[in-house]
Amino acid sequence: HQLLYQGAKDYYIPLWLESCVELPLKATTKGAKEDLRRIRKHQLTYELSTDLEALQDFYNNMYLATIHARHEKSAVSSSFEEFSGVVSSSDNKLLLVKHGETAIAGVVLQMTAVPRLWIAGIRDSSNTYRRMGAVGATYHFPAQYLTEQGYRQMSLGRSRSFFNDGVLQYKAKWNHHLSGFDKDGMVVKMLTAS
């Protein structure tokens, strides 16, 4: 983009933004407090798993179900081999959100210098589980676990770089700050009338 990005009227828009939160996670917004209320009300808990059966269940019934419900035919997913390779390599972890004995959601934690939420999903992409606080739990429980492990920051992963993007807006309720962006993007050149 260097040839295109040359003037004061040129604007670079990255495809993806990365955001982080400070740990311990503090619920200061009305939305975050409501998420925590739902988690407590429904007595959601979490567990970490490396069990192959749990990985397959998460991949098929949470991750794929969620992205296919959200993106339908345009969904592009990682293969199970790629997914399980990332989870089983290094110290990466699958965190499952549970209601009783049922895993209702999950998120993969990439255990880097600043641990990162990689992919998440809700069982059967269920709105019932969403209303129970499953989405908030995929942020709250990793933050709780990482705080207990001594981490001071957690990456919330990538979001589209448009401020009206729903995922980016959701992350704002947890007081995130933008910590980086993709090198891939587009350049907008502002033209003048001739």
Model-derived features with residue positions:
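Terminal substrate-recognition subdomain of acyl/acetyltransferases
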Residues: 1-41, 159-194
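A conserved beta-strand-loop-helix scaffold within acyl/acetyltransferase catalytic domains
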Residues: 5-130
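Aromatic (often tryptophan-rich) hydrophobic motifs at membrane interfaces
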Residues: 95-193
